């Protein structure tokens, strides 16, 4: 069973607890005992999971996007990138582990890969600052994109952040400028770039790694200019109304594809990416490979033109 269940998953959790209890009884009762009962319960749990995830509202999707067991950047690197060599530091101030990146081979193709890393436990979450990057993280991203262009390598990014770190030190070191430079660098990159929103895509801290030719999004991920809690605090002076804000912000993958802010939705396993991380990772890999193959046929000038047209069209199309 999963270690963490969301509120709407409680009936599934109860059923899986019964499955576990029955499985333990079958071990003492002998081979084949309760086999049909266990299988029937598993089938029922799977059906409940499909039904629950088919009808998620925007706030529930936000909770799924933030699920602590959802695969993060390092999981995608481990599952998709061979011969990965991490590159550290911005060559100006420090190395920010909220953004991890380097060189590797994606299904045989040399690439530059980078993204936000949130961490999976207390130690790694603190190390990676919960995926909230400081200026040096975005300057590291610019450095990696510069390298990609110099050596004519495609860029693959994974976006998963609540937003850039808002601390005093980050602001003193030029957080806004660093985000702007990273966004700009992606928009004028002369090599193919594919970004995937794999969890949260929050504010400028997310778009700084998503100035890509193609922006993909996992089925239950979100992408927005501000968190639902932040929007509720501004609109109603009450962060507790985050659910109301989420319902009106058009932050889900399904909203975003209709608005033409993202280009493709990657389906998740029944029960979300956290229910079967390996399958989710391979689904993302298949989608990225598909997009990358088409983009690699374009010249640098064509890539820049396509990317510019894509972003200029946002706000003009899909709003009818």
Swiss-Prot record:
Keyword Nucleotide-binding: yes
Compartments, as annotated in UniProt: Cytoplasm
Catalytic activity: N(6)-carboxybiotinyl-L-lysyl-[protein] + acetyl-CoA = N(6)-biotinyl-L-lysyl-[protein] + malonyl-CoA
Cysteine pairs bridged by disulfides in the record: none
GO BP: any one term: fatty acid biosynthetic process
GO CC, any one term: acetyl-CoA carboxylase complex
Entry keyword Transmembrane helix: no
Domain CoA carboxyltransferase C-terminal: 33-294
Pathway stated in the Swiss-Prot or TrEMBL entry: Lipid metabolism; malonyl-CoA biosynthesis; malonyl-CoA from acetyl-CoA: step 1/1
E.C. designation(s): 2.1.3.15
GO molecular function annotation: acetyl-CoA carboxylase activity; ATP binding; carboxyl- or carbamoyltransferase activity
Keywords of this entry: ATP-binding, Cytoplasm, Fatty acid biosynthesis, Fatty acid metabolism, Lipid biosynthesis, Lipid metabolism, Nucleotide-binding, Transferase
Enzymatic class: transferase
Family membership noted in the UniProt record: Belongs to the AccA family.
Function according to Swiss-Prot or TrEMBL: Component of the acetyl coenzyme A carboxylase (ACC) complex. First, biotin carboxylase catalyzes the carboxylation of biotin on its carrier protein (BCCP) and then the CO(2) group is transferred by the carboxyltransferase to acetyl-CoA to form malonyl-CoA.
PANTHER family tied to this protein: ACETYL-COENZYME A CARBOXYLASE CARBOXYL TRANSFERASE SUBUNIT ALPHA, ACETYL-COENZYME A CARBOXYLASE CARBOXYL TRANSFERASE SUBUNIT ALPHA, CHLOROPLASTIC
Subunit and interaction comment: Acetyl-CoA carboxylase is a heterohexamer composed of biotin carboxyl carrier protein (AccB), biotin carboxylase (AccC) and two subunits each of ACCase subunit alpha (AccA) and ACCase subunit beta (AccD).
Protein name: Acetyl-coenzyme A carboxylase carboxyl transferase subunit alpha
Gene name of this polypeptide: accA
């Amino acid at each position: 069973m999963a270690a963490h269940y969301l509120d709407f998953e409680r009936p599934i959790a109860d059923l899986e607890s019964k499955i576990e209890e029955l499985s333990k009884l079958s071990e003492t009762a002998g081979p084949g005992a309760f086999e049909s009962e266990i299988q029937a319960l598993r089938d029922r749990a799977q059906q409940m999971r499909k039904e629950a995830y088919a009808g998620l509202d925007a706030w529930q999707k936000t909770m799924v996007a933030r699920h602590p067991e959802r695969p993060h950047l390092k999981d995608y690197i481990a599952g998709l990138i061979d011969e990965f060599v991490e590159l550290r530091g911005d060559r100006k101030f420090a190395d920010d582990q909220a953004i991890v990146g380097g060189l590797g081979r994606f299904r045989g193709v040399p690439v530059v890969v980078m993204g936000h890393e949130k961490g999976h436990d207390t130690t790694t979450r603190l190390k990676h600052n919960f995926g909230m990057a400081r200026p040096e993280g975005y300057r590291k991203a610019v450095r990696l994109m510069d390298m990609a262009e110099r050596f004519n390598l495609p860029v693959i990014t994974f976006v998963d952040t609540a937003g850039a770190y808002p601390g005093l030190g980050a602001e003193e070191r030029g957080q806004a400028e660093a985000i702007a430079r990273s966004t700009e660098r992606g928009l004028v990159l002369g090599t193919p770039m594919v970004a995937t929103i794999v969890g949260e895509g929050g504010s400028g801290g997310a778009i700084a790694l998503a100035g890509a030719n193609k922006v993909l999004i996992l089925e239950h991920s979100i992408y927005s200019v501000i968190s639902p809690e932040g929007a509720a605090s501004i609109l109603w002076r009450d962060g507790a109304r985050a659910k109301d804000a989420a319902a009106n912000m058009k932050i889900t993958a399904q909203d975003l594809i209709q608005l033409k802010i993202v280009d493709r939705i990657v389906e998740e396993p029944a029960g979300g990416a956290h229910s079967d991380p390996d399958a989710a990772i391979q689904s993302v890999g298949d989608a990225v490979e598909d997009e990358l193959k088409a983009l690699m046929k374009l010249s640098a000038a064509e890539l820049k033109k396509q990317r510019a047209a894509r972003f200029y069209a946002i706000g003009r199309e899909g709003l009818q």
